[in-house]
């Protein structure tokens, strides 16, 4: 089975669970809205704090890149990363909690998912601090490195993402610290699929293909109705893309919960095929 075919089947199986429990889509919606609100609040606060200093220092668009390397700007960006990481992980924990309930025959409600995330809020905040720190460090190193250095940092980033793959469900279901969650996540992954692996699926690729009809609709509207079609088609395409984004986030959360259950219990959750779950990651030749 090819990588795209495998990915398509995984999306279908995950979507079947989403279709049976549509409340799962509310978590990505709330996550997105919360991130927008947090970004706006931080942006307004940042302007209020830094604008007088920016004016006093005579910072313009031409010399802003120099200001962007200052400790003050780095601190502001860290707060931005921290806040958004917290929001994203918080709602992902809630999503994985409800998805896990569905996979194991339970019937958790939306509120129960939020309650789970709320009980984990402090460890989620601690993990957000760790993730924001690593993200900032990798970003800073990448900006200062040459071509080879960026390749090495990219490899480190991939290894970090794999090690973190099960951090969200571990935070949700196991009473551990952020460091222990990272260790447990990496342990589950390597014990189940090995240390050197390649992805046997790409949910992002499937949703990229699903985006094509949205662009096609917009181009068709422009060709048929000109400027009016561009506006109307843009509205429809935007709504379609938002729906795909919500569905993509929900499907990824469901699949993450399914793989976590398999990694813990070595039993394939109901609704998923054994071959697809076992082959989600393959040993690297």
Residue locations for each model-derived region?
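Hydrophobic alpha-helical membrane segments
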Residues: 1-285
């Amino acid at each position: 089975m090819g990588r795209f075919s495998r990915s398509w089947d995984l999306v279908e199986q995950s979507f079947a669970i989403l279709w049976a429990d549509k409340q799962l889509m509310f978590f990505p919606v709330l996550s997105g809205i919360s991130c927008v609100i947090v970004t706006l609040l931080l942006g307004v606060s940042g302007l209020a704090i830094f604008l007088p200093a920016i004016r006093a220092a005579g910072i313009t668009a031409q010399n802003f890149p120099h200001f962007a390397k200052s400790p003050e700007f780095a601190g502001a960006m860290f707060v931005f990363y921290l806040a958004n990481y917290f929001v994203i992980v918080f709602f992902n924990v809630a999503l994985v909690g409800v998805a896990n309930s569905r996979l194991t025959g339970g019937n958790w409600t939306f509120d129960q998912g939020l309650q789970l995330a709320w009980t984990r809020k402090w460890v989620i905040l601690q993990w957000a601090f760790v993730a924001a720190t690593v993200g900032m460090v990798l970003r800073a190193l990448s900006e200062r490195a040459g071509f080879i250095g960026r390749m090495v940092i990219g490899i480190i980033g991939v290894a970090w993402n794999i090690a973190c793959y099960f951090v969200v469900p571990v935070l949700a279901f196991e009473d551990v610290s952020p460091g222990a969650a990272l260790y447990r996540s990496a342990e589950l992954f390597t014990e189940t699929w090995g240390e050197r692996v390649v992805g046997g699926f790409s949910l992002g690729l499937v949703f990229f293909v699903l985006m094509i009809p949205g662009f096609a609709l917009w181009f068709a509207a422009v060709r048929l109705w000109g400027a009016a079609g561009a506006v109307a088609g843009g509205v429809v395409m935007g709504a379609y893309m938002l729906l795909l984004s919500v569905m993509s986030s929900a499907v990824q959360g469901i699949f993450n919960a399914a793989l976590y259950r398999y990694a813990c219990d070595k039993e394939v959750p109901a609704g998923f095929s054994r071959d697809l779950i076992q082959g989600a990651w393959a040993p690297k030749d």
